[in-house]
Every structure is written in C-alpha cells, then in structure tokens.
C-alpha cells in the first residue's frame, strides 16, 4: 500500500494489503540466520504500515539492522518512531516521487520537511540519510529535468557545495 501513485513504480496484480506483524516476525526468523540487514522498500510506502514500530522493535530484538526507502511524505508523521528505532540503520528518501504525483503541498514544503528530518537525524542519531534523485535524462520531459535542477540547487545551497552535486 502506498500513499502515492508514481508513474515509475511497477504495477502488480496482487491485492493491496499491509504486511502484518505475524508474517513479518516469521520472515525475520527465517532470514536472521542469513543476514544482518533487511530492506523495507518497493511496492509500497513502509512508513504507511501501521506495524512499522513493531517491525523495527522486532528487528532490533534479533540484531537485524533496517534500511528503509521512502517517498518522504510521511517523515514528519513518523519522525519519533524513526528517531527512536534502535534497529534503523538508513533512511533513503526518493525525491523524484514528488514530481510524479499531484500533491496538496508545494515542493518547497515537502523538501523543507525532508531537510528538517535529516537535520534532526544528524543531530541526534547515527542513522544514515540518503536523498535519491534520478539522473538528468535528455529523453525526459523538460519539467522533470527542471525539477531535478531545482532540487540540486537547493541541495547545493543547504549543504554549502560549491560544485554541482550532479557532476
């Protein structure tokens, strides 16, 4: 289940549903002898799942580190859960999801929420934050490339980069 409908996400024929806590624990028990990491991403927005906090706690109990990929729209709502999760290793934020949807907020509001979350994570935790942006593409529409340019300029300004981060 996702709160967006991005054009770049693959469609599926299966019914939309959330992974429940019982099934998640079963999967954790199956994979924990084989890995130290799990990844919550693809085919849905992990921050939308009502069991997120339990998932993170159960992973911690088993010594599993969690990496999450999100569209970033629910970071503010889930901030406390994420900041307090002892299992959370990395949060990847797909910035390109904003342009693929009609949103009730402006890009600036969305991006400021993302940056505010990253600032707090950097000040208070060891969690890694990664902003993802699809590369410039001559075949893409002018609007997509213009938003990429806007995002990279904002990143350059926020973090004081003198060189373009896209180079």
Residue ranges of model-derived segments:
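Conserved alpha-helical substructure of the radical SAM core
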Residues: 1-91, 102-109
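Radical SAM enzyme [4Fe-4S]-AdoMet core and its adjacent flexible, acidic
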Residues: 19, 57, 62, 84-167
């Amino acid at each position: 289940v996702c709160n967006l409908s991005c054009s770049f996400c693959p469609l599926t024929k299966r019914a939309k549903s959330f992974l429940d806590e019982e099934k998640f624990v079963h999967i954790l028990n199956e994979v924990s002898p084989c890995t130290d990491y799990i990844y919550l991403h693809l085919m849905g927005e992990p921050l939308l799942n009502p069991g997120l906090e339990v998932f993170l706690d159960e992973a911690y109990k088993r010594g599993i580190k969690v990496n999450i990929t999100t569209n970033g729209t629910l970071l503010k709502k889930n901030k406390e859960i994420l900041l307090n999760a002892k299992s959370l290793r990395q949060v990847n934020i797909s910035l390109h999801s904003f342009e693929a949807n009609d949103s009730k907020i402006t890009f600036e509001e969305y991006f400021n929420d993302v940056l505010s979350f990253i600032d707090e994570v950097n000040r208070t935790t060891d969690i890694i934050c990664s902003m993802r942006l699809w590369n410039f593409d001559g075949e893409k529409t002018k609007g997509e490339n213009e938003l990429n340019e806007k995002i990279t300029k904002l990143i350059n300004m926020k973090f004081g980069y003198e060189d373009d981060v896209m180079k």
